[in-house]
């Protein structure tokens, strides 16, 4: 984790570049400086405000608690002091902390670090991303938060995480879907591929309607994609079809260039709405960009 974190912190603390070296040293010492480990009261520790995980499996927490009860805590949690004296905020190790609570232990071994909000958020986000246990929506929110914290492009973020840019872009597109669809992914009522199939519909009311149909009829991904195609065809059929003139070569090139540019804007994470209408003498392209 050290390599990924140092690269992020180097970008995230632009006013104090020397912090990159200091933080690398702190992370490297994590497992070696045993004198830093302290026994902290469990009830003095609060969850990480930047924790990307919103759902914790009670079964997994119980399994971890059983392991801890048998073998103890092998790796201490990491915390930072809060403004309230004697209180701490988790940086890493929330599952261990929750497991210890179920065991009703009074204290837990911890390492105290002096991290900023940006550093704390980055540790929490990257630690969870590397565990690959997040839902698609939680992962998407983690990517969005890292982009915001470190002022990165999607391409730069993908490089730093060792992932393909398309992987990051596809996850971020999920955040453009209505809240109902995102919640269905979190609750595992539909898969990520189901959700991605809904993106071309664009209109939230159509996406929600098909979501309900997927759940009620238990449609698989292929069936969902077929329904999307039909819904798009029906949407097109409702529009009046003007008499068409043949497109000139220059017009085709211009439209293709505009469409490619719009795709690039969408891939950057900006949600835009577009609508094309053909008239007898011209093509009208309406673009709505949020402020």
Curated annotation (Swiss-Prot):
Keyword Transport set for record: no
Main localization of the protein described in the UniProt heading: cytoplasm
DNA-binding region extent? 155-174
Q: Which domain of life is it from?
A: Bacteria
Q: Is DNA-binding set as a keyword in this record?
A: yes
Mind telling me which CDD domains this protein's record contains? SPO0J_N
Q: Give the UniProt subcellular location, in the record's own words.
A: Cytoplasm, Nucleoid
Q: Which GO terms describe its cellular component?
A: chromosome; cytoplasm; nucleoid
**What family does this belong to?**
Belongs to the ParB family.
* UniProt name for this protein: Nucleoid occlusion protein
Q: What does this protein do?
A: Effects nucleoid occlusion by binding relatively nonspecifically to DNA and preventing the assembly of the division machinery in the vicinity of the nucleoid, especially under conditions that disturb the cell cycle. It helps to coordinate cell division and chromosome segregation by preventing the formation of the Z ring through the nucleoid, which would cause chromosome breakage.
Quote the NCBIfam families the UniProt record gives: nucleoid_noc, parB_part
* GO terms for MF: DNA binding
User: Which keywords does UniProt give here?
Assistant: Cell cycle, Cell division, Cytoplasm, DNA-binding, Septation
GO BP terms: namely:
chromosome segregation; division septum assembly; positive regulation of sporulation resulting in formation of a cellular spore
């Amino acid at each position: 984790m050290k390599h990924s974190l140092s690269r992020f912190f180097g970008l995230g603390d632009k006013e104090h570049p020397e912090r990159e070296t200091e933080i690398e040293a702190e992370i490297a010492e994590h497992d070696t400086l045993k004198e830093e480990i302290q026994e902290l009261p469990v009830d003095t520790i609060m969850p990480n405000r930047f924790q990307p995980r919103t759902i914790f499996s009670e079964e997994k927490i119980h399994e971890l608690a059983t392991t801890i009860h048998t073998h103890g805590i092998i790796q201490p949690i990491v915390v930072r002091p809060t403004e309230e004296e004697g209180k701490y905020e988790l940086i890493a190790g929330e599952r261990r902390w929750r497991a210890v609570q179920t065991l009703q232990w009074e204290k837990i071994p911890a390492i105290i670090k002096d991290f900023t909000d940006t550093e704390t958020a980055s540790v929490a986000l990257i630690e969870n991303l590397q565990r690959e246990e997040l839902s698609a929506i939680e992962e998407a929110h983690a990517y969005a938060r890292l982009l915001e914290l470190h002022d990165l492009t999607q391409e730069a973020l993908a490089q730093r995480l060792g992932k393909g840019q398309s992987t990051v872009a596809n996850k971020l597109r999920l955040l453009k879907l209505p809240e109902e669809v995102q919640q269905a992914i979190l609750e595992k009522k539909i898969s990520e591929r189901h959700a991605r199939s809904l993106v071309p519909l664009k209109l939230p009311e159509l996406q929600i309607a098909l979501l309900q149909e997927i759940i009620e009829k238990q449609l698989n991904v292929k069936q969902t994609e077929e329904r999307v195609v039909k819904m798009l065809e029906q949407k097109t059929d409702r529009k009046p079809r003007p008499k068409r003139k043949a497109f000139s070569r220059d017009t085709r090139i211009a439209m293709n260039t505009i469409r490619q540019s719009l795709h690039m804007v969408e891939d950057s994470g900006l949600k835009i709405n577009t609508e094309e209408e053909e008239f007898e003498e011209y093509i009208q392209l309406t673009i709505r960009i949020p402020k």
